Amino acid sequence: MGQKVNPVGMRIGITRDWTSNWYADKKDFADRLNEDLNVRQLLQKRLKGAAVSRIQIERPARNAKIIIHSARPGVIIGKKGGEIEALRDEISKVMKVPVHITIEEVRKPELDAKLVAENIAQQLERRVMFRRAMKRAVQNTLRQGALGVKISVSGRLGGAEIARTEWYREGRVPLHTFRADIDYATASAKTTYGIIGVKVWIFKGEVHAPKPQAEEAAPQETEEEVK
């Protein structure tokens, strides 16, 4: 069977960047990585209803900078910034350095694979038919300017005895093209029949489009002067 590699991991360094940007000595690397994982788990747990798309972690000299991409920044900030202050203190205890938090708004959540996958998972938990949820998500994403969308759901769909996989695609999703800007994410829906996995691929266009070949200049005919 053909297996598909993670489109985001395959494009790191080409069209995508790392979500953790820092340097550490060999003896400190494992501790720093563990801190990053703990911070991400903490943020995902605390900001479950804030539509968080991506979390970037940077470590300048003796402090940390965390960039949270969210479709609902007001939920994270809270009244008069109270929520974000408490969050900053909690993260500082985990990372043991001063932390600066920046929130960036996701203006088009329909073009974000993580938010689309979580939205479908929430609909499945509310017992919405999986085909209706997939088609509605695909139409909304294409309406916002995506060139192609593919959605796959796996599990006991509709309460069936045997688990299966269903997928729906519109447009083109060129997974083999490295310059293609493809966003990919997964989510899980916890239903009464078990867990249903959701995968979303969104093709937004080509980042490094090939330059059109210059047309060969036609040889210019020069008129010789008649003596």
UniProtKB/Swiss-Prot annotation:
InterPro entries: KH_dom, KH_dom-like_a/b, KH_dom_type_2, KH_sf_prok-type, Ribosomal_S3_C_sf, Ribosomal_uS3_bac-typ, Ribosomal_uS3_C, Ribosomal_uS3_CS. One of its GO terms (molecular function) is mRNA binding. Coiled coil: none annotated. GO terms for biological process: translation. One of its GO terms (cellular component) is cytosolic small ribosomal subunit. The keyword 4Fe-4S does not apply. Residues 39-107 form the KH type-2 domain. Keywords: Ribonucleoprotein, Ribosomal protein, RNA-binding, rRNA-binding. Part of the 30S ribosomal subunit. Forms a tight complex with proteins S10 and S14. Belongs to the universal ribosomal protein uS3 family. Binds the lower part of the 30S subunit head. Binds mRNA in the 70S ribosome, positioning it for translation. NCBIfam families: rpsC_bact (TIGR01009). This is Small ribosomal subunit protein uS3. The gene is rpsC.
